[in-house]
Amino acid sequence: MSAGTNIWRILLVAGCLTLPLSSVRAETNAPAPATFTTPPTSDADRFFTQYAKAVQLVRQNGRQEASVIMDLLWRNLGSSPWFEIALLKHAELNEISNAQVALEDYDVLRKRVENAPYFQGTADRAAVFRAALLGSAMRGTDRIRIQRIRDALETYSTRYHQYPESLAKLAIFNYIDMEDIHNSEGRLFHYTPTGQRFTPAISYHTYVIEPLAPEPFFVSSPKLDGTTQLDDKTRKFAALIRVPGHMDPHRVFEDQTLEGYFVAAVAAGGAIVCTPEHVLVLVAPE
């Protein structure tokens, strides 16, 4: 990544830079056309509109195209939590196809959550959102590191026809960086060489490494049946959400908890629900 891009990301982390959705047009001497006042599009509306498009592309095996949409989206959102959620989803899409970009996204996400005023304080929403986003970023980083370990183990096995006794040996022999054999909290990943043989020295021909399930870009459960605006004066909404084990939807509001899901945000286009470890985006049906 270029120095200019790094500076740009630093400004984003500090909250000193946002990007407009529309491109800048050249000034002309022509009189401005008559315009009609329309309600401004909020970051929440932008997020759910573009995220819904990305979900459709992922369902059609268009992950690369979906990644482009999410990349443009997070770069054009300026407010929390929509910026952070868009960045998280962009990172999740890139874990396999572009791991370095995903790692950079997770790094920016952690710093934003640690510094953005929205996630500070002791209120339930701030605390749950903060824990869920930080946990998602840490697990995403760990998934990438585990995959790097697997790749390094296969390279080692191709050369030596066995697996190493430890991950430390893998790093000492320069098959992987020392940082990548540790998780986000600095703990060495659990690795056990198996398939022991005596040929004549002891060698290992299989291994077990701690699993970490991928984070889904979208979920089918819980399911959002729709949203309703509470009144004409505010932009507050209620959500109708179906949770596993219940036939009927529940009408919920922001800051409520439903069967273990904390309703962190509700807008016209969808809702965000959190568990202590996950951030789930629920899109309103068309």
Predicted regions and their residues:
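Hydrophobic/aromatic side-chain positions at a characteristic register within alpha-helices
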Residues: V58, N94-E95, T141
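Short solvent-exposed coil/turn linkers within tandem alpha-helical repeat scaffolds
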Residues: T41, L73-F83, L109-A132
